[in-house]
Amino acid sequence: MQDEFDLFRTETKGIKPIKQDTFVAPRQKRDQKKIELKELRAKEDTLFYFSDEYEPLLNDNDGVVKYLRDGEDSHLLKQLRRGDFSPELFLDLHGLTREQAKQELAALLLACENEHVDCASIMTGYGTFTLKKQIPRWLVQHPKVRALHQAPREWGGEAAILILVDL
């Protein structure tokens, strides 16, 4: 065994170690102006569609939040109530501020449009009801929302809202 080590040392005598020549790709600088512009547009969209002062006439006389856009078939609300539509996108708003919730709602509606999803679920939770009462008021202002209804028990019950989006 020692002979092998000696043989190796004699054979490799005078050899210089190879320098590490790994190429590190330069980091791409994110264009800060583009990022700021994108954030500003998202904020403008939420402010444009979701006004806090608007008080729509919602059908909540029996404690169930529901809305149907003018010109839509009244059967849609019944289908939403029964759970005939399965939500493909889910949004959980627990613990968010009003401004954060507005931005998330706008992002959800944009995602529904981009991914061709017509039904989504918004989890509002039970909590202090500030978001739970405000979210339907915001949603009815958006032109893409066809209908909304309190979710059936299997999709969240009183703590969630199902929405139908116009594609």
UniProtKB/Swiss-Prot annotation:
Keyword RNA-binding attached: yes
Gene Ontology process terms (BP): rescue of stalled ribosome
Top EC class of this enzyme: hydrolase
SMART domains, A to Z: SMR (SM00463)
E.C. number(s) listed in UniProt: 3.1.-.-
GO molecular function: RNA endonuclease activity; rRNA binding
Alphabetized InterPro entries for the sequence: Smr_dom (IPR002625), Smr_dom_sf (IPR036063), SmrB-like (IPR022990)
Domain Smr intervals: 91-166
Family: Belongs to the SmrB family.
Subunit description: Associates with collided ribosomes, but not with correctly translating polysomes.
Protein's UniProt name: Ribosome rescue factor SmrB
Species, as recorded: Haemophilus influenzae (strain ATCC 51907 / DSM 11121 / KW20 / Rd)
Gene: smrB
